[in-house]
Amino acid sequence: MNQNKHGIIGASNCGCASDDVAKYPLANNPYSSALNLNSCQNSSILNWINIIGDAAKEAVSIGTTIVSLITAPSLTGLISIVYDLIGKVLGGSSGQSISDLSICDLLSIIDLRVSQSVLNDGIADFNGSVLLYRNYLEALDSWNKNPNSASAEELRTRFRIADSEFDRILTRGSLTNGGSLARQNAQILLLPSFASAAFFHLLLLRDATRYGTNWGLYNATPFINYQSKLVELIELYTDYCVHWYNRGFNELRQRGTSATAWLEFHRYRREMTLMVLDIVASFSSLDITNYPIETDFQLSRVIYTDPIGFVHRSSLRGESWFSFVNRANFSDLENAIPNPRPSWFLNNMIISTGSLTLPVSPSTDRARVWYGSRDRISPANSQFITELISGQHTTATQTILGRNIFRVDSQACNLNDTTYGVNRAVFYHDASEGSQRSVYEGYIRTTGIDNPRVQNINTYLPGENSDIPTPEDYTHILSTTINLTGGLRQVASNRRSSLVMYGWTHKSLARNNTINPDRITQIPLTKVDTRGTGVSYVNDPGFIGGALLQRTDHGSLGVLRVQFPLHLRQQYRIRVRYASTTNIRLSVNGSFGTISQNLPSTMRLGEDLRYGSFAIREFNTSIRPTASPDQIRLTIEPSFIRQEVYVDRIEFIPVNPTREAKEDLEAAKKAVASLFTRTRDGLQVNVKDYQVDQAANLVSCLSDEQYGYDKKMLLEAVRAAKRLSRERNLLQDPDFNTINSTEENGWKASNGVTISEGGPFYKGRAIQLASARENYPTYIYQKVDASELKPYTRYRLDGFVKSSQDLEIDLIHHHKVHLVKNVPDNLVSDTYPDDSCSGINRCQEQQMVNAQLETEHHHPMDCCEAAQTHEFSSYIDTGDLNSSVDQGIWAIFKVRTTDGYATLGNLELVEVGPLSGESLEREQRDNTKWSAELGRKRAETDRVYQDAKQSINHLFVDYQDQQLNPEIGMADIMDAQNLVASISDVYSDAVLQIPGINYEIYTELSNRLQQASYLYTSRNAVQNGDFNNGLDSWNATAGASVQQDGNTHFLVLSHWDAQVSQQFRVQPNCKYVLRVTAEKVGGGDGYVTIRDDAHHTETLTFNACDYDINGTYVTDNTYLTKEVVFHPETQHMWVEVNETEGAFHIDSIEFVETEK
């Protein structure tokens, strides 16, 4: 996910473990890394405020993957998710492990108290242990696919090696005798590594407890009770992580009273929550004793990002809001963080607006900014609304939609470095809200003097698979907004200098309390919509993943609204996770009546809350709900006072009824038999991947108790069919596990593409293409490399469309095959019969699908009717696969209309067979024509390429493009850029993002141009001298503006009293050249003046009738370049631009050192 400047981790050479790796895991460890401490330590707050650290970015993705892992429905699904998790932990897209990244991030706020070798050893051991776990996972995957004595033996061996290594480096969470991840004085720096390693160890032990008997793990001597070890280590690892988190927390809290001290403390709390506490919160759900099946896990904690206020990214340019002179302080900032409160959901915000003024002119609004908030929130499954109030409220208000906001772009303003506010905010909503954006709009005065400066600050937590979240890929949503002063001095009476802070909850915290009939549903009790009198919310002790409910006497805990799937007539068992200093009786009431359970005390009064303080207790009586939504009331009895009862969550465990029948078995047998040839060694010619998945659905629906043997045999057969289907599929990642990866091939997609999983239509994943946005189509595509293809061969693209409108399917080789699908949503009804599997009776559903498909297969159709079929096939033929150009096959799916859409899956590209006869002759003729046209295009491209290359060569003085020609200016770079832009066939005409035949040379030249632009900007002592960033870094009066012509920006002085100026620094006593490219429009003169502190001055004058530096006479409306040599005697310099009349256009201003 992140891009990082620190140490690089190498990748292993193969995905399998050799015997040497297994025996000597850390010898020549390919995942070892040496930290670059100089780049990690003492990072200025200016470099990280309002920015999520690199390690925390990865941790957000890792934490979300862990949530998915806990809900994994099968061993196969679990293995796939864990492979993904390992990739993120060992490197992600940054190439660095979470161990490297977290240490570097923490060193920016925590003192280094150990030698670098201790940290290097910890990183190496962490990476090595995860590598050993991956070796174990490979053996588990092999055993799962082919369980036999050999695979079981290999699995046991690798399990024991990994288990021993985790024991060595984690030392059972000892606080006094730590292993390499718990060394003295390094515990806090290594804590994220410890938490991640502990999670993998617990996951390893969970597998042993669940599957170990089948491996023969428990036949060994001496006998080891891995279930007991798992339960014990969950507690030990939890307590260790919480202990050292709190140590760092308290150290930073005592560091000082300044705003800077608070920001460091706040960063620690936020990022260690993401890197450590979120992982720790999942530990309890790995206890196989309590969670033998998949579990819905929810994080209810709130992450508060840094306050939004104007920040000078250079300390030389002014005072930021947290500067000492502005009086923001630790206490006031910390007090603005809300106390624990209900886990409710944001509906909308009512934002109050007020003025920013100067004391000398209190009636003149310099800006109008965010003064206060009224967040309107609701409980889950409820229409009840209450308000959370912060800041100061005015009569000028704006109401902003608050549902499912995953990103906020704020504009902070600064008045004379003394008064602060937020004058604008754009709120990004997810796809369920139409991917819309809501805008709060204040006001910024832009005329006159003493106007505010503004700064854009983007606030979000990354998506699971993207640094910048999207409407489809995000991990957190906005839960609260807070307007605060933080102690800022108030320089103008009756006015408010303030900041804005955002709070975020994890997307796993569901807005609807839906009880799943197929897995355990955990619901944090902070989601109650009616809290009992006397109930308080208390802070997470560090391992809950959110706040707790507390009572000190008997009475109601509250009312929780839940949604049951009543059509299933499902039964559930109920249990709670709680801690109590006294014996209690808990009653639960709902449409099912009232059930009660005695709960014993778990802790002593006055003790700190630890993992062992909590117990999970199940009610003896199951329930069968009769209403949905239902109101669940929880009450604590009998009478007591001055005790402590804490309740974390309530859980619903489904009681699975028998739901199979003989006809389901017969339908499954028929579906499986239809997949194979008579000899059963291959798939029938016309069988598509969709048919294999649907047959597997029918088999999975069968009862293990009644049809265990039949189901086993059918599963083996259908798995064989699926393997055959996957083996022949030339498309990579047909399950859409990774989209827009950094790999060369694989799926690439635009915004508006989402992945859906489950449901009645697809066994695996499907893709959904939303409607296009104006001129931006929604698309997903993949290239099959030419090395995977055979010359003069026919290939077929297959898939299944649930429904679509204006779906275009293109197959491109050296020609294009185009298909349009408008498929009605006509397969099954919206209601599903009782006794269904996973909420859907898949056996009956498949019968309905089959009936519709039979009609499509046997009914004669015209072209319009064919476009409406759910299944599709498209054919394309290859030519001679000329090695001089990559002639792979592109498979493209796109929607270009604003009312189009599509849901499709089971995509495969398969070889049909070699061409022959007329088909072969036709392809040979087409291939000859295509080769001739390619030669013509290449000749034309080569001419343009040579001209562009020569122009770019002129920009540099060396072959490595590391030094710019001192004689060139921006005009030379623009001339070269225009030549590069004239190169054709850079991208495909089907989808702009697909490379064309000239993509590589275009990219080569563009990269060199980019280097030239970078060097041009770097050498210029004048900031923003090309005005590409508007008037940033310039002091400008009215009448000065920046305009744009194509890719060129230029300064315009439109009146004789307009002026811009800038102060900058140089090396004194060096030779510099002032070079200006400008044009004078109309009468009068334009001036660019340079001066130093010693009052040495030089001026370049421009008028409508002038000569350029080459002596060429120019006329009005022509840009020319002038230059003058200057030897500054002081460090500080000023440049000023003005004119006498008419208009003055300045393309660029350079002040470049030419000689030391």
UniProtKB/Swiss-Prot annotation:
Promotes colloidosmotic lysis by binding to the midgut epithelial cells of insects. This protein is toxic to Galleria mellonella. This is Pesticidal crystal protein Cry9Aa. Coiled coil: none annotated. InterPro entries: Cry1Ac-like_dom-VII, Cry_V, Galactose-bd-like_sf, Pest_crys, Pest_crys_dom-III, Pest_crys_dom_I, Pest_crys_N_sf, Pest_cryst_cen_dom_sf. It comes from Bacillus thuringiensis subsp. galleriae. Belongs to the delta endotoxin family. GO terms for molecular function: signaling receptor binding; toxin activity. Keywords: Sporulation, Toxin, Virulence. Toxic segment of the protein is located in the N-terminus. Pfam families: Cry1Ac_D5, Cry1Ac_dom-VII, Endotoxin_C, Endotoxin_M, Endotoxin_N. GO terms for biological process: sporulation resulting in formation of a cellular spore; symbiont-mediated killing of host cell. Residues 1-23 form a propeptide. Disulfide bonds: none annotated.
